[in-house]
Amino acid sequence: MSVIKMTDLDLAGKRVFIRADLNVPVKDGKVTSDARIRASLPTIELALKQGAKVMVTSHLGRPTEGEYNEEFSLLPVVNYLKDKLSNPVRLVKDYLDGVDVAEGELVVLENVRFNKGEKKDDETLSKKYAALCDVFVMDAFGTAHRAQASTHGIGKFADVACAGPLLAAELDALGKALKEPARPMVAIVGGSKVSTKLTVLDSLSKIADQLIVGGGIANTFIAAQGHDVGKSLYEADLVDEAKRLLSTCNIPVPSDVRVATEFSETAPATLKSVNDVKADEQILDIGDASAQELAEILKNAKTILWNGPVGVFEFPNFRKGTEIVANAIADSEAFSIAGGGDTLAAIDLFGIADKISYISTGGGAFLEFVEGKVLPAVAMLEERAKK
């Protein structure tokens, strides 16, 4: 994959527009999970250190496009950056007609989704973004799968378009995991729905030596084996697809599960054989024997790709399966790469971030890359590198 890298450029005195992924959860005006901002800090600091005129922006939440809404302002991100950086940080609301930035100064340009045409990759808006800078740095892997004005369009018109360190590292790590993986390669796909991850399961079934399913996805596979899943979240219309995948590759289906009669944080958990799930019960986690079976598989892996928990780990009574799997990945000597919001939350909860080889900041982009889809922002950077 040939792209221009920000680290290869001299940014001194240049106007540098960094599209980061600062889409973080905010409550009462404060950032509640800073993982994405932390990941972007080295890129921002590198540009500042070189004496660039630094502009950074992102989307945050889902405001009505083209309308300012204080609830989705990047102000909490600016306040966070002020605490973390020794530099002053300014938030600029109106910037499309130009913004003054001094060398070594950082300004945050307000939420790109307040600009009409952002999501449609509007050419006029893209050109306005491009006119603000000498160098465009795409560093938001989490939105690289979307062709939008601040992730894709701007790169077509900026004088120079390059990949930031975070994006470059994501592409390198995913390339290593998917193109030439050390074997055996184990892929874990969890979460609630088969339908949203069916193409991922299909793609991974062709490259992974072992596929593991968890969460609501596993319930569909349990049903495909003829077991009653009671009131569990599963997709009846995809049982045949699950049967097809079971016939073409080795997928361990849970033999024991933790169930409850209601979906609640306080619901007591009952551990039982997968054969004994009652009509009024729902499966909320895999059982101990199933979790240990997965831990054994992971122990022998050389590459692990992890996307999604194996149970409702947010509820303490249904956390054990995901905890056993997470610790098995942490203890493994394999090259491990993890991605997706729920996966990152589990990594934080179990305190294993330093034991995962690479943590991807992307959710949808991570999955689309795994599927082998072309990411528009990356394709644009490759195209610009040829000129």
Swiss-Prot record:
Q: Which InterPro entries match?
A: Phosphoglycerate_kinase, Phosphoglycerate_kinase_CS, Phosphoglycerate_kinase_N, Phosphoglycerate_kinase_sf
According to the UniProt entry, what is the EC number of this protein?
Answer: 2.7.2.3
Q: Where does ATP bind?
A: K197, E314, G340, G341, D342, T343
Gene3D superfamilies given for it?
Answer: Phosphoglycerate kinase, N-terminal domain
GO terms, molecular function: ADP binding; ATP binding; phosphoglycerate kinase activity
The protein's enzyme class:
transferase
Sorted alphabetically, the Gene Ontology BP terms of this entry are: gluconeogenesis; glycolytic process
Keywords attached to this Swiss-Prot or TrEMBL record, sorted alphabetically, are: Acetylation, ATP-binding, Cytoplasm, Glycolysis, Kinase, Nucleotide-binding, Transferase
Pathways involved = Carbohydrate degradation; glycolysis; pyruvate from D-glyceraldehyde 3-phosphate: step 2/5
- Give residues where N6-acetyllysine occurs: K84
* Protein family membership: Belongs to the phosphoglycerate kinase family.
- Subunit annotation: Monomer.
For this entry, the protein name equals Phosphoglycerate kinase
Species assigned in the record: Escherichia coli O9:H4 (strain HS)
The gene name on file is: pgk
